[in-house]
């Protein structure tokens, strides 16, 4: 997909009456436009990162297309932009659904929540077996779609390998998810056996055993520090 230049005037016109979904101290980061599409802004980095060579907007678009190619729903990319101030942006149609975190928060029956966690375990294994290393994987970046399937959002920080992930990369992925208090309780405490059962539907026994040992070790360390 070609990258278009977006002037400040055109940006202001595009975002007129838009709803700010996410912002930081420098301004809006994600905007819900009046036509129900979204615009995600990536500001120029002041230090070296891989995004200095390949803008995060382009990585977002490339990863979205590659994921869709292997059957994982992601936002549909409409346009890519470079802005005169050095920022970049991606214009896309959102996936219809709610984050897995929101859905789990709304479930009151433990058995229903457990079944959903098991399904997520299978989905996570699918990502790992297909070589998807989503560095920012957490329950706020996984959507439960209207048909009940899972999709991914905010996919700029990702690498897709030609073969299944190594055990070390799977461990790093889990460590990232363990940083989120609510996610950790649902996935690795309350419904950990369900998560393992789902993961085992697709992943190898060695991968399942590695996941189990890592979570158990983290639990022991937390209790020791407590």
Language model regions located:
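Conserved ATP-binding subdomain of kinase catalytic cores across diverse folds
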Residues: 8-99, 119-130
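Juxta-kinase regulatory segment immediately upstream of eukaryotic protein kinase catalytic domains
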Residues: 1-19, 218-223
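Short alpha-helical scaffold element within the canonical Hanks-type protein kinase domain
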Residues: 113-117
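AlphaC helix of the protein kinase catalytic domain
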Residues: 100-109
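C-lobe/activation-segment region of protein kinase-like
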Residues: 151-226
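A short beta-strand motif that forms the metal-chelation/ATP-contact edge
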Residues: 89-94, 149-155
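Conserved catalytic-loop position in the HRD/HxD motif
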Residues: 131, 136, 154
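Hydrophobic residue at the +6 position relative to the catalytic HRD Asp in the kinase catalytic loop
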Residues: 137-144
């Amino acid at each position: 997909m070609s990258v278009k230049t977006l002037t400040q005037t055109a940006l202001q016109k595009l975002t007129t009456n838009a709803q700010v979904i996410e912002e930081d101290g420098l301004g809006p980061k994600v905007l819900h436009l009046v036509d129900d599409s979204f615009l995600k802004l990536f500001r120029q980095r002041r230090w070296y990162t891989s995004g200095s060579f390949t803008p995060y907007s382009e990585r977002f678009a490339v990863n979205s297309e590659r994921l869709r190619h292997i059957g994982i729903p992601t936002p549909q990319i409409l346009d890519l932009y470079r802005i005169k101030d050095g920022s970049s942006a991606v214009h896309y149609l959102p996936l219809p659904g709610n984050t897995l975190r929101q859905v789990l928060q709304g479930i009151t029956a433990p058995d229903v929540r457990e079944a959903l966690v098991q399904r997520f375990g299978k989905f996570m294994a699918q990502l790992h077996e297909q070589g998807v290393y989503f560095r920012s994987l957490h329950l706020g970046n996984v959507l439960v779609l209207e048909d009940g399937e899972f999709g991914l959002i905010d996919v700029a920080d990702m690498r897709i390998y030609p073969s299944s992930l190594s055990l070390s990369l799977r461990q790093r992925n889990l460590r990232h998810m363990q940083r989120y208090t609510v996610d950790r309780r649902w996935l690795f405490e309350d419904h950990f056996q369900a998560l393992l059962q789902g993961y085992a539907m697709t992943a190898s026994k060695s991968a399942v055993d590695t996941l189990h040992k890592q979570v158990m070790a983290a639990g022991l360390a937390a209790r020791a520090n407590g």
